[in-house]
């Protein structure tokens, strides 16, 4: 039992070093080259609950999301944002055909950006 507890403690220490290494630029080694300096994920990432993000988040590639995505407040995006599924809570799929006026970007332009709001939303 003691061996298992010691192993679990070591694993937790490695996880803490990885987290602090990505935030601070160095791990517990204090800049001596012993820390983790970021990384790239490969595989599945599951998030249950809230995922607060402050600042800028750059995502290159695809992020598949199975389930619902809810935004509270502004969700600003530069570049192209494609949302497949339902863009708004009315169930129309973001096409604006239900009369709710969501049109994909919230201003009723249909997501084409022709209204001058500067936001584009491609809903498929």
From Swiss-Prot:
Region (Left arm): 22-35
Residues in the signal sequence: 1-21
Span list, region Central domain: 36-83
Region ranges (Right arm (Gly- and Cys-rich tandem repeats)): 84-124
Family per similarity comment: Belongs to the chorion protein family.
Protein name per its UniProtKB record: Chorion class high-cysteine HCA protein 12
Keyword Signal attributed: yes
Organism: Bombyx mori (Silk moth)
Lineage of source species: Eukaryota, Metazoa, Ecdysozoa, Arthropoda, Hexapoda
